Amino acid sequence: MKYKAHDYQTYATNFILEHPISAVFLDMGLGKSIITLSAIFDLCLDSFLVRKVLVIAPLRVARDTWPAEIHKWDHLHGLTYSVAVGTEAERKAALRQRVSVYIINRENVQWLIEESGIPFDYDMVVIDELSSFKSYQAKRFRTLLKVRPGIKRIVGLTGTPSSNGLMDLWAEFRILDMGKRLGRFITHYRNTFFRPDKRNGQVVFSYKPLPGAEEQIYDAISDITISMKAVDHLDMPECVHNDAIVTLSEKERKAYDSMKQDLVISLKGEEIDAGNAAALANKLSQMANGAVYGEDKRVFQIHDRKLDMLEDLIEAANGKPVLVAYWFKHDLERISERLHKRHIPFSLLDDSDSIRRWNSGELPVALIHPASAGHGLNLQAGGSTLIWFGLTWSLELYQQTNARLWRQGQTADTVVIHHIIAKGTIDERIMTALRKKEKTQTALIDAVKANLEG
C-alpha cells in the first residue's frame, strides 16, 4: 500500500531522524509504528547511520503488529526484520539472523541482555509502549538501564500521559536520557513536582502533582518529546478511526467457518444453529467477538482475541479514560471479568451517578451499550477514546455512540475511535457497511448472502 503521510506523521518522522533521543507521545491510531519505521528505513538503508535496531513491544504487538506494518507499506520494501518470540531456541534463531530490525517482546528483555549469550550490539532501540518501563524497580528497567550507555539512538513510543501518569515519566525518561532532564533519582523528582495525596500517617499511598508541575515537567522534556500539544499547529484530524485487527487460530476459524457454511456448529456436544440469514449474522457477530449463545442462553467461549486486544488498547491509552462499546450481554460479562482480573477499575454507564463519575474523571474505563448512548447524552468531559469491542449494523447507533465523545465541548485535540475487528469475519463487512452508509437491513442480508456463497 502506498503511504500518504499526514503532515504530523512527516513531522514526527523527521523529529526522530533529527533527535538521537526521542519520545513520541501520540494516541494509538495516529500511526506511531509507521512514523518510526519510516525513520528506521532512512537510518538503516538511506543514511546508513544505524546498523541494527531492536524493537521492544508487548507480545501481541511484537508478534503481529510490527511485522504487519513492515509488510503493509510499499516504501518500506527492503527493510529486513526478524521476530524473536516463542521458545528460547526460536528466539535465539531469530536473533542470529542477519537483518536490520529485531523485534522482541518486553518480557524477554532481561533474558536477551543477561541470559541469551548473544551480544547486545544494537545501536538503536525502539520501546513501543514506553509505559512498559514505568516501574523503576522492575527487572526489565534495571537490566535495560545497564546497557543504555552503549545505545546510540533510542525512541520511546506511548500515548499522551494523563496527569496521573506524570509520576511514571521519571523511569521512562531515566531510560531515554539517563536522567539528564528529570533527574537521576526518583526521590528528587517526587519532591520537586509532587505532594502526598492519600496517606495514613507517615505512609503515603499516592502523590498528586503540585500546581504548575505538569507544565514544568513537559517543559523539561520538550526538546526531545513530540506530543499532541507539540503538533497543535498541524492540520490534525478532528476524529481518527483505527482498526485494531485480531486473527483467529485455525481451530477458532474452523468453528466460525462451520457456522457460516452449515448454519450450525457443535460446541461441547451441543449443536448451535442459525435458522435464517438474520440469525446467522447474529451468531457470526457473536463468534467474532469471542462467545456465542446456545439454545438455552448458555454461553460458549470461542476465543479471547478481542479481550487481549482490548487490554492492549487500554494499556496504550496510558492512563487516559477509555469508553468501551459492547453489543451482546456475554460481551459485557467477559469484558467485566477480564477487567476485574487485571484490577482495572470500571463501571457500566447505566445511571446518572456512573455518568457523573465518568465525566468527573473518576473512571479509567466505562462500558456502554450503543442503544443506551442516546442523543443528548454528554460524555465528552470524561475522555476522548472510544473502543468498539463489538460492532453494530445500525448506522444510527454507531454514529450517535461516536458522537458521545466527538462533539462540541470536547477539550481534547483529537478523538480516537478504535474498532476491534476479527480478520476474515463478518466484522469486516459490518465496517464496510457503516463506512458506505448502506441501509442496515440490505447490508446485513447481502453480507450473509456473500458469506453463504463463498
Predicted feature locations:
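Conserved Helicase C-terminal RecA-like lobe
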Residues: M1, E18, L30-G31, I35-L45, ...
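Conserved pre-motif I regulatory segment
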Residues: M1-F25
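Conserved helicase ATPase motor motifs in RecA-like P-loop NTPase domains
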Residues: M28-G29, I151-L166, R174
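Conserved Walker A/P-loop ATP-binding site and its immediately adjacent core
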Residues: I35, V50-K72, S163-D168, F328-K329
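Conserved helix-turn-beta segment of the N-terminal RecA-like "Helicase ATP-binding" lobe
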Residues: V61-G86, L176-G179
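Inter-lobe coupling linker of SF2 helicases/translocases
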Residues: I103-V109, E114-D121, A138-K152, G156, ...
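SF2 helicase motor core recognition
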Residues: Q110-E115, N164-L166, L332-S336, I355-N359, ...
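A conserved SF2-helicase RecA2
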Residues: W393-G454
